[in-house]
UniProtKB/Swiss-Prot annotation:
Keyword Ribonucleoprotein: yes
UniProt organism field: Pyrococcus furiosus (strain ATCC 43587 / DSM 3638 / JCM 8422 / Vc1)
Protein name per the record: Ribosome biogenesis protein Nop10
Domain of life of the source: Archaea
GO molecular function terms noted in the UniProt entry: snoRNA binding
GO biological process, one term: rRNA processing
PANTHER family named in the record: H_ACA RIBONUCLEOPROTEIN COMPLEX SUBUNIT 3, RIBOSOME BIOGENESIS PROTEIN NOP10
GO annotation, cellular component aspect: ribonucleoprotein complex
Keywords attached to this entry: Ribonucleoprotein, Ribosome biogenesis, rRNA processing
Pfam families, per the entry: Nop10p
Signal peptide residue numbers: none
Ribonucleoprotein listed as a keyword: yes
Amino acid sequence: MRFRIRKCPKCGRYTLKEVCPVCGEKTKVAHPPRFSPEDPYGEYRRRWKREVLGIGRKEK
């Protein structure tokens, strides 16, 4: 399934275009990535979050 709706990170408007018609900024897909229980990169993403944000459990 291909997502069509996009959002401008600068002005926050939704559009179907690759470039925002209001401010000219490149738009991004407005949908979050699909969830999978077998996420092969989930461990690395959670570790990065703990290191950068300083939250969650600490590794020994």
